[in-house]
Structure formats: C-alpha cells, structure tokens
C-alpha cells in the first residue's frame, strides 16, 4: 500500500515540471502524502525521502540515475517514467503514469533489483573515497590530446595495460549506456555480471569482456599526466599516476518498480535501438 510518495522532476524540462505538478495533485487527491522536488532539494533534505514508499522519476535516464542515488541507501523503489527520451531504464511514458500508479496502489507490479558497483579510490595505500554506481565507473583522459595508460587486474590476476581514451567497468544496467557507445556488449539487466570495456584502445588485442558477478577489477593509472574518475557520469575526480580504483559489486541494489512482464526487455531493447 502506498502512503508516501516522492516525485522527482527535471527542472530543465517543461514537460517534467508540468507532469510533476499534475501527478502530485492527483496523488494527494487520493490520500497519498506526496513530496515533489528536484534532486538537489532531496539531497539537502534526505529526510524528505527516507520514509517514502516509492519515488516516481519523471525524465530521461539522467533523472533516473539521480533518483537511484537518492533511493538505494534507503531501499526505496523507483518508478521511472520516460518523457520523450530514448530510455533503457523506463518502460512507461506519461500517458501510462496514472494507470501505472493505480496498478501499484492496488498491489500490482513487481520489483526489479539491479546490481550496483562500488568503487574505492586508493592513493599511496590510503583510501581517499568510496562511490557507488548504477551504470558505470570510468577512468578517462583529462587532456583531449593524450591517451591514458590504465593497468587492469582482475581478481589479482594481471590482464593488460590499456593505452586508450579510457576504461569502463559497467553493470548489466550500464551495458546499454556509455559502455554500449564504446563498443561493449549488451547484457541482460537481470544479470549480476560486470562488463569491462576499453574506450578507443590502441595496440591491444584484449577486447571488451563480460566478468563474473564477484569479480574485483583494479585499475591503476600509469600515465604521468592526470586522468579523471567518473561515477555514473558525475564526480570527475582528478587522478594522478599510481592511483588505483578498485571496483566490485556492491551489497546494495537499486530497486525499480515494473508493470510489464520481465520478458519484455528484448522487445523494448529492439524498439529503442531502432529509434536511436
């Protein structure tokens, strides 16, 4: 039963703003306590989200990623609603949001648990930080004219040193995002496997790889010039030579609410790729 719902909208999208207002009024009229806001507001006041039963994310995949960041620490499920964008995370559009909410209010739908990855940044034996991603962790060049040298180890076994524009470690969910654009394989999102994808690699015969779910991937920067660490397209942390980023599956998951059968993924995938 839904008692409290958070509605996340994109402040740069008129369609998202309009639908968020209308949906909030619709939910309140049905006796559901509803909090409407943008990601910054919910980050600054996490108590607004912590006791919610559901977050509805209105926008593209960027909005869904922001919703995931807000919700997974509290185990709150997310209902993604795509607004005119090519989306691999959302299965319904604005025309279905009200019937979808009614379906959820009546006990329908199912929970789709997606794998997260955790990345730890180490420098000279000291852990500098820890970050969690739904899509991917990326080491990339910070200078457009230079490539980076990234030494990759999997489960303590050296793999190779990529001379590339960057290296991606993605989840199955992220396999249809940056990793796909870089030439990586598409992995069924129900899988817990990880994907290793070099970005425009030079002089290497090691292609993209699908790794087992408990793989531990260590990426060490071996370039004298700086590089950047990005987590789901955010953070952009400066890296220096010798820095290590250790990526493994997180014990936490991101939960989406789905209204269609799980076997619809491939049908939706083909439709989305045809539109891209």
From Swiss-Prot:
GO CC terms of this entry: cytoplasm
Q: What Enzyme Commission number(s) appear in the record?
A: 2.7.1.23
Q: Name one GO molecular function term.
A: ATP binding
Q: Which domain of life is it from?
A: Bacteria
- Its EC top class is transferase
**Residues annotated to bind NAD(+):** 61-62, 66, 135-136, 146, 163, 165, 200
What is this protein's function per UniProt? Involved in the regulation of the intracellular balance of NAD and NADP, and is a key enzyme in the biosynthesis of NADP. Catalyzes specifically the phosphorylation on 2'-hydroxyl of the adenosine moiety of NAD to yield NADP.
Would you tell me the protein name for this molecule? NAD kinase
């Amino acid at each position: 039963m839904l008692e409290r719902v958070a509605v996340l909208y994109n402040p740069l999208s008129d369609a998202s703003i309009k639908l968020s207002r209308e949906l909030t009024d619709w939910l309140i009229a049905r006796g559901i306590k509803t909090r409407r806001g943008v990601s910054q507001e919910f980050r600054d006041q996490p108590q607004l989200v912590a006791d919610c039963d559901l977050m509805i994310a209105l926008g593209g995949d960027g909005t869904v990623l922001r919703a995931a960041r807000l919700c997974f620490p509290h185990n709150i499920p997310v209902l993604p609603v795509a607004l005119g964008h090519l989306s691999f995370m959302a299965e319904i559009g604005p025309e279905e949001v009200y019937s979808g909410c009614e379906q959820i209010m009546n006990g329908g739908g199912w929970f789709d648990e997606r794998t997260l990855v955790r990345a730890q940044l180490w420098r000279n034996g000291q852990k500098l930080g820890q970050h969690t991603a739904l899509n991917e962790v990326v080491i990339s060049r910070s200078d457009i004219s230079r490539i980076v040298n990234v030494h990759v180890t999997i489960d303590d076994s050296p793999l190779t040193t990529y001379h590339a524009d960057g290296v991606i470690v993605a989840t199955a969910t992220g396999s249809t995002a940056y990793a796909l654009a870089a030439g990586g394989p598409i992995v069924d999102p129900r899988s817990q496997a990880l994907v290793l994808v070099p970005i425009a690699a030079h002089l290497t015969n090691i292609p993209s790889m699908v790794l087992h779910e408990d793989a531990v991937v260590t990426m060490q920067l071996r370039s004298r010039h700086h590089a950047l660490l990005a987590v789901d397209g955010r953070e952009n942390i400066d890296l220096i030579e010798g820095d290590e980023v250790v990526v493994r599956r997180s014990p936490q998951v991101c939960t989406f609410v789905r209204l269609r059968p799980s076997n619809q993924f491939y049908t939706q995938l083909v439709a989305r790729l045809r539109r891209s």
